[in-house]
From Swiss-Prot:
The keyword Manganese does not apply. Keywords: Endoplasmic reticulum, Glycoprotein, GPI-anchor biosynthesis, Membrane, Transferase, Transmembrane, Transmembrane helix. Signal peptide: none annotated. This is GPI ethanolamine phosphate transferase 2. The chain crosses the membrane at residues 405-425, 431-451, 455-472, 533-553, 561-581, 598-618, 667-687, 698-718, 733-753. It is an enzyme of class 2 (transferase). Its EC number is 2.-.-.-.
Amino acid sequence: MRFAFFGIFWLQIFGSILFLLGFFPHKNDSTGKAMSNQFSPPAVIDQVVFVMVDALRADFVFSKSHNMPFTQSLLYNSTHGIGFSAFARSPTVTMPRLKALTTGTIPGFLDVLLNIAESDTGSSIEAQDSWVYQLNSFNKKIEFYGDDTWLKLFPSAFSKFEGTTSFFVSDYTEVDNNVTRNFDHALPSSLSHSWDALILHYLGVDHIGHLYGPSSPLLNIKLLEIDTIISRIYKYLQEYDEKTNTHSLIVLCGDHGMNEVGNHGGSSSGETTAALSLLFPSNELSHINKPILNMDDNPYSILERVEQVDVVPTICLLLGIPIPKGNMGKVLSPVTELWKDTKTAKMAALSNLFQLSLLKNPSLTTSELSTQFQDSDLNDIRLALENLQSQMVAQSSSYSLDRMLVAISILGACSILSLILFRNLYNYKELLAFAPFVVQNIIIVFSSSFIEEEHVIWYFAAVSLSLLQLLNPKTRLAGSLQLFCLSIIKRWNQTGQKYSDLRDIVDDFIAPSTFMKTILCVTSAFMPAIRSPSPINFLSSMFIAFYKLMPIISKHLNELPIIASFDYTFFVRIIWSLLLISFLSKPTFKQLRCQLSLFILLLTRLENMGLYLLYDIWQRTMPEEGTLASVMYYVAEQVAFFSLGNSNSLATVDLSQAYTGLDSYNIFAVGILLFTSVFAGALWWCLHQPKRMMDRSVKTFWIMSSISLTFLCISCFIMRHHLFVWSVFSPKLLYNASWASMYFLAKCLISTIMVRLR
């Protein structure tokens, strides 16, 4: 049976991968390069500085409540700057957004995985047309300093460069200082720089968002730093343009925004609304940056809304280089007045229209387009650009239907084979108990609203099971304690989409209170050691509590040398060593459970550590065997996943815990730590099931996850043209694939080892 089971498992893994490849096809980006056409206008800009600030939400630049006085003075009190709220299409992570900002294309959702993997070969787009390539083809020199993702995308494009690591999110100071320190060379006082294009990518804003959220006072300090940098660049170029009689452009933009927690990757208005500003030190524009009056649907979209990819044809036309072949952007209307006569401005818009038209009709000639629009004015061409762009964006998604259908057949067969294989595992009563959850899992995946608010369904299921215990006088006290715990667990973190911005227990009682954080941290850290007492376990618990509270301690005692020079990475490695030594010295069931529980606590946010105290009370009051116990432990794993603040959106993935104990980026180490931190709650319940239930629990989880994944794939196939396919169904598919593969493997491994220990 074991060999048959693992055969089915690997067949399901194959089916899952096949479906993902069909649903998230890695786009075969155009390898052709654009050439100048008869509409190409002369250049009106001689050099450009492209300043990318990671996670720069539109309101960070345009709202008076944020600290960018110099930039705002250019936008609101001068004629030298224009600003836009740029729509960054999902997925809102760095690599796909950089592809969009350089090629004008709309990247696929699979780029999320490449963004995390940082594969050099998988990431490079040098074979694809972009404004970076076009500048190189015109023998323009480009210098780059900042996020090394650019170096992976364009390995040989820059004459001078220095990269910084983007994934080490715990640093938000040095990572930006390492960019600015190149200014003495890039912006010399002699005004004799050697570049035609300078690209700078700052990461500090993004890292502060991940660590502390957009409401942190650190954000305004960082924004002022960015504003000072923009001021320095602007004044340098102003002086340079005056001396050399040239014209320069500064592009200040974000690759994406961030939500109210500080994360990104999803499709909320905060994540998809990025800043885009064009600053002209020696040119003036008549455009007035008027705030949008009705911002009810998007409070972050302060100025005129445009597609983020619109910056690509704008840069190309201003610099007099061909627009990338696969571009789907349209030139920003206000800049066309830089061509002083209307005829040339019209030619610039026609050049963009011709490039977009070739995507739809490759056989189109310039003469045909010229004839079609010979009597049209500039506004007519702009309208045609808008309509054509809308059509091309709508057609940008492609699927491999054959792969998807074959994969669904394989996954369906795996589900049926699993039911046949374990048909003797359950009696009629047990099948009846699990049936509602099978039906529930099927219903959830066919509704975008249910997927977004799935946590509500699992909370309801947990409460219902606890209420059942109130019917029996013997379990009435246990049921009451469970309901008490669940009432707090449900309100600990607001998650999902609809009510995620509402205040929760963390916001109101834990985050503002040093006392509450300290009490909950210390109590939670010592709970595993109390369950499995030994001197080394208590020492590990003490070290974990000290490590978690160190940021609080350092605020008050930072003047002490031992605090100021505290090495977090080395200290975490000491904790890891203690956990390993403790288990090897006494390899028992309780000891392994204790060490893994402590490891999970180490990778949990300080504000969430108190949840494990509630889990502990809930678990101790559960029945130790029987159908109800099996169902309750299955539901508890789901509840724990959501109660820690997770959801079916990639935006809730907390990268900050994935670097615990690391001093550099390593994909395997980060992957393991990230997986553990995301599924920490579910893993805790896996560890704390009664030993005699573990094998049965693994098989139950397998059947449930297999059926759920099969029907989710069917749902994604049916809903592939749904409005929320990328923002709702796609992240859910990635999560479910992780549940059915990585989490199941971890659960299987833990159960196999623990069952064999005494």
